[in-house]
């Protein structure tokens, strides 16, 4: 699920933190990719007539088709992908996972009913909701990556957190995931839509954490508190607290402790905090996740030449893929992984840190922008009020 409405909040309050560009802009870069999120998106998106792709023996192959061709697309564009797989989820996440399982069960039942009585659109909608990534999907994707010569590692718990560690250490340029909570784990740069198909024509979103914090006027701890208020995988959200309210509460009170205190002491009882809401535990999971340090032996990785014949054996003979396409893909891998060894010019230079004066200037501009927005909203509200007060037919 990630963090609800976080992209919207950053887009509206820290637009300089987001860049949209073409996949070609990332030539020569190493990227750590959230594998489980990618596989889930492949299972949903790679379909034929509303159904997942199957081999002749009835095995699902959508995850392999997506992994093979989307990885090829990255390598064709000079990117060196590293996939990171989820480990065991933190205990605090078990409640959210239980809810997801229940929703899948409901969707499965609705899917069966739609097949009997519903429209094609209903069948497609509920079919997508039943999708879940299994151990078998993960194991087959790992086998495929090994044969392709693409490295992968297993995270102790959350893949996004491990991707963030590698990005902070400079072992990769960025972490790639659709989950915005990757920023909560302190990934300096988050790439979204990297594993989308070319047909979707979605630009790659590049989100810079330091610019987001500057634009929001927050430190990292406040940012995490904001994300918990917005709604994360570890806790159920506070009813009636949307993105604007969450942002206002953190800016006004500065921390979740003070937000909770203000809500509990509010005589109007406008918001009600859930009975079990261990926000401090959730914050701790974001601040100190269970990860391996970047210099750990299990975080060593390298790209190798594909094992062409073993790839053909697995994808063509076992899974029913087209042999010409698989061999063509293997040839592209061999050629383009060598090309991607070229260094980007930016790798020779270190970014210059902003001075205190520059930071103060940015904060001043941000505060001025906020004041302008507040003033505009007041004027709009006043104009609406005056328009309502006018009698009908009045000029």
UniProtKB/Swiss-Prot annotation:
Q: Where is this region: I-domain?
A: 122-253
Domain of life per record? Eukaryota
* Compartments (UniProt record): Nucleus, Nucleolus; Nucleus, Nucleoplasm; Mitochondrion
Keyword annotations from UniProtKB, A to Z: DNA damage, DNA repair, DNA replication, Endonuclease, Exonuclease, Hydrolase, Magnesium, Metal-binding, Mitochondrion, Nuclease, Nucleus, Phosphoprotein
| UniProt entry tagged with the keyword Metal-binding | yes
Q: In its keyword annotation, does this UniProt entry include Metal-binding?
A: yes
Q: Which GO terms describe its molecular function?
A: 5'-3' exonuclease activity; 5'-flap endonuclease activity; DNA binding; magnesium ion binding
InterPro entries, sorted: 5-3_exonuclease_C_sf (IPR036279), Flap_endonuc (IPR023426), HhH2 (IPR008918), PIN-like_dom_sf (IPR029060), XPG-I_dom (IPR006086), XPG/Rad2 (IPR006084), XPG_CS (IPR019974), XPG_DNA_repair_N (IPR006085)
Fill in the PTM field for this protein: Phosphorylated. Phosphorylation upon DNA damage induces relocalization to the nuclear plasma.
Annotated binding of DNA, by residue: 47, 70, 158, 231, 233
Its BP terms in the Gene Ontology are: base-excision repair; DNA replication, removal of RNA primer
**Which family is this protein grouped under?**
Belongs to the XPG/RAD2 endonuclease family. FEN1 subfamily.
The annotated subunit structure for this chain is: Interacts with PCNA. Three molecules of fen1 bind to one PCNA trimer with each molecule binding to one PCNA monomer. PCNA stimulates the nuclease activity without altering cleavage specificity.
Question: What's the protein name?
Answer: Flap endonuclease 1
- What is the organism field in this record? Aspergillus fumigatus (strain CBS 144.89 / FGSC A1163 / CEA10) (Neosartorya fumigata)
High-level lineage: Eukaryota, Fungi, Dikarya, Ascomycota, Pezizomycotina
State which gene encodes it.
fen1
């Amino acid at each position: 699920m990630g963090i609800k409405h976080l992209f919207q909040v950053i887009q509206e309050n820290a637009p300089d933190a987001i860049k949209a560009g073409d996949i070609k802009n990332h030539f020569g870069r190493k990227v750590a990719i959230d594998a489980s999120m990618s596989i889930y998106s492949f299972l949903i998106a790679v379909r034929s007539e509303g159904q997942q792709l199957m081999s002749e023996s009835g095995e699902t192959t959508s995850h392999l088709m997506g992994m093979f061709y989307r990885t090829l697309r990255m390598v064709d564009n000079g990117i060196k992908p590293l996939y990171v797989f989820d480990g065991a989820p933190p205990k605090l996440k078990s409640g959210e996972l239980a809810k997801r399982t229940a929703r899948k069960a409901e969707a499965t039942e609705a899917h069966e009913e739609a097949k009997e009585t519903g429209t094609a659109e209903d069948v497609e909608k509920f079919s997508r909701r039943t999708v879940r990534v299994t151990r078998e999907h993960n194991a087959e994707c790992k086998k495929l990556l090994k044969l392709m010569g693409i490295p992968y590692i297993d995270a102790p718990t959350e893949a996004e957190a491990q991707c963030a560690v590698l990005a902070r250490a400079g072992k990769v340029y960025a972490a790639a995931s659709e989950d915005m909570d990757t920023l909560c784990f302190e990934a300096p740069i988050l790439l979204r839509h990297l594993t989308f198909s070319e047909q979707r024509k979605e630009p790659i979103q590049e989100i810079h954490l330091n610019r987001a914090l500057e634009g929001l006027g927050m430190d990292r701890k406040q940012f995490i508190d904001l994300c918990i208020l917005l709604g994360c995988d570890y806790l159920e959200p506070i009813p009636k607290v949307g993105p604007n309210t969450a942002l206002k509460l953190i800016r006004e009170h500065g921390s979740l402790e003070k937000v909770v205190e203000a809500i509990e002491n509010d005589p109007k009882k406008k918001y009600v905090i859930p009975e079990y809401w261990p926000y401090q535990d959730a914050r701790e999971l974001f601040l100190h996740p269970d990860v391996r340090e970047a210099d750990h032996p299990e975080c060593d990785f390298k790209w190798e030449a594909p094992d062409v014949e073993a790839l053909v054996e697995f994808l063509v003979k076992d899974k029913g893929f087209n042999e010409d396409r698989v061999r063509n893909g293997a040839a592209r891998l061999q050629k383009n992984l060598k090309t991607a060894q070229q260094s980007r010019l930016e790798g020779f230079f270190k970014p210059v840190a902003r001075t205190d004066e520059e930071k103060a200037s940015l904060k001043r501009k941000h505060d001025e922008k906020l004041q302008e927005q507040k003033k505009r909203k007041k004027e709009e509200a006043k104009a609406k009020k005056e328009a309502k007060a006018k009698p009908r037919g009045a000029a």
